[in-house]
Amino acid sequence: MQVIEFIAAQAASLAATRRKIHAHPELGFEEIRTADLVAQKLTEWGIPVHRGLGGTGVVGIVKNGSSQRAIGLRADMDALPMQEFNTFAHASQHDGKMHACGHDGHVAMLLAAAQYLAQHRNFDGTVVLIFQPAEESGGGAREMLRDGLLEKFPMQAVFGMHNWPGLPVGSFAASPGPVMASSNE
């Protein structure tokens, strides 16, 4: 099965997961419910789970073949400290907290990749699935690194992604070098 077909077949489940996360936003270093959901899904798909890096961070490991090569795929999990005024069914149920930057979608997208990789394993190497806390307030990546992320899970490259509402559906954008990264840390 092709990736697009697989994702399309999982669309309803992925949307439900994103909506569940959206309805229960958690601020930086408070992503306990989200981390529990991520760990439960990864475990369900047979992916070994490592918790506690950076406080509430979650790491899943998908291996196949004999290569020592490894890449990381990263999604941020935290919400923003702002009130949601949307009225749809999955609007925030927590006053003063909202997934306004799309991290609920980022988690759902990385979970989709995790599920596909776990079920198809058509690669040679290791994929480290990094669910990072506290991106908005800062410090989540730093704390995961302090807790030994790169020592425990050596990787040749780490890829993060971010939704971009102005980009047409089905489009993909890339740029050489860092994008949307803080230049002062």
Question: Can you describe what each PLM-predicted range is?
Answer:
Residues 1-99, 108-111, 115-116, 120-123:
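Acidic/His- and Gly-rich active-site-bordering loop/insert found
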Residues 58-59, 80-82, 86-98, 105, ...:
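Histidine/acidic-residue-rich, glycine-tolerant segments that coordinate divalent metal ions
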